[in-house]
Structure formats: C-alpha cells, structure tokens
Amino acid sequence: MREWTREERYRVLKSADEISGLYEQVQRSIYRQAYHVQPITGLSSDPNGFTLHNGTWHLCYQWCPWGAAHGLKYWYHTTSRDLMHWENEGIGLKPDCYYDNRGTHSGSAICKGDKLYFFYTGNHRDEDWTRTPYTCAAVLGEDGKLNKLEKP
C-alpha cells in the first residue's frame, strides 16, 4: 500500500459533490453492512456522544471521508429510535475554526434540561505543525444539527 501524503490526509471536504463518486462506489460494495453503523465513505474511528435524548439515540463517530487513512477528522452524526435502524444525519462537526483547524477529535455528550450538549477535542495545528488541543462544545439545535459554541 502506498503512504498517504499530509496534503491528502488533511484535505478539506468542501462539498458533498467531491465524494459523490466515492459514495456510489461504496454503496455498491458487496461488503456493505445492512445492520451496523458504518461510514458513507472513507474511515470511521472513535464513536462519540452516544446518548439517548428525547426518545432518539445519537451516535457520532470520527470520520475521514477520503479513504482508510487517518487525517482531517470530522464528526459524522447518526440517529436511531431502536438501536437497529440508523439514519445518517450528515456531518455533525466540521474542522472549520481556529480551535479545530486540523480535526474534530474524541468527545462525549450530556443532556442538561431539554438540551443535548456535545464536547469534543479540537485539534489545532499552527504553521510549524505544532499541535494544541482544545476542549470544544456544540449543542443540538431544534433542526437536529450540531451547532458549535463560539469559544471553548
């Protein structure tokens, strides 16, 4: 196998169109699961934020959309009412701010009142590639989307 370059591993996903061909190829795979949570493309790793909130189970996982290589991590969001049938809700958290410019890494979730909060490790790297981790937070909106809180 060939080694992925840093540029390949940390490529930013700008639109769903960029992975549409890869998505179609993955959907046709004879190895595609019919029961378990799995990524729409690429690599999934650490499950995060596994929580029951208002009758719906929420499960996010770290996701690298391009292939089986660790790099720029997103959180992909899935939901279920029965833990058997899962719905893909799309990207939950994108690495798109100063605090997580090189990935949205492991975290958790907690229900407080009627709100569901998600906490994750923002992976920041500077121009010298020095890593600084930040504890970041998001809240589940009424539209079912995760909304980042402004500052860690």
How should these model regions be labeled?
Residues M1-P152:
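Beta-rich carbohydrate-recognition and catalytic domains
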